[in-house]
Amino acid sequence: MKQLRLILACLALTFPLLTKAGERASFRYGMEWGVNSAIHVGSHSSYISGEGYLVDSRSLDFRSHINGEVMGLIGLEYKRLGLYVRSGYMGLQKEECVVPVLLRSSFALSRSGVEKHGSIYIEGGCGLQKSKPVSAVTGTGYVYRLRLSEKLALDMNGGLRISYSHPDVYDKYAEQKVPKESLGLSNSLNIGLALTIALVF
């Protein structure tokens, strides 16, 4: 929760510095869902096998597994700038899911705002898992906003997703999950794409 408090504090402190006297930022909230795929995965693991041998494994793979994600978001928009906190449930790769806490910053490509030519974004934060080290999650991409009504918009997001995670490791000889007490390390760098849609109020 320390990471979440830090992100919320940054969000609260930044916008008063950006807005001028008499001008107000717009508060936004919504729900986002979609898919992502870790296409390029580099992993490194080490563990003690059931026979007592030290196994050190490194791999570099191209994959096509599709992961889902469901997120809630809150944020502020001021002219061409946007700051949002996003959290929910996200798959990083096959059989590995996290609770992400992400801070997204966006910049509209038109002076008229995000609805004219969309916006570009960059985001970063952490992915939380029970009894595992914290993962790092970051990304960048493009958002196209379609106004559905005066108070409701549909955002279509697409971009690059990069994460550094700590997946479960399976003993390639015993074909079973390596227990925590036998695991030395498990690191995975995942590079892929994310496509989502969001209803924003």
Describe each region flagged by the PLM.
Residues 27-36, 71, 118-122, 149, ...:
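Non-catalytic effector/regulatory segments
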Residues 43-58, 98-125, 164-178:
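A subset of solvent-exposed loop/turn segments in beta-rich extracellular surface proteins, enriched
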Residues 40-44, 58-60, 89, 138, ...:
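Predominantly the C-terminal beta-signal and adjacent terminal strand-loop region
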Residues 20-83, 87-89, 131, 190-200:
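Short glycine/proline- and aromatic-enriched beta-strand/turn motifs that initiate or cap beta-hairpins
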Residues 4-7, 88, 106, 118, ...:
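Residue-level detector of intrinsically disordered/flexible regions characterized by low predicted structural confidence
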Residues 71-141, 146-154:
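Gram-negative (and chloroplast) outer-membrane scaffold detector with strong preference
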Residues 1-26:
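Cleavable N-terminal export/targeting peptides
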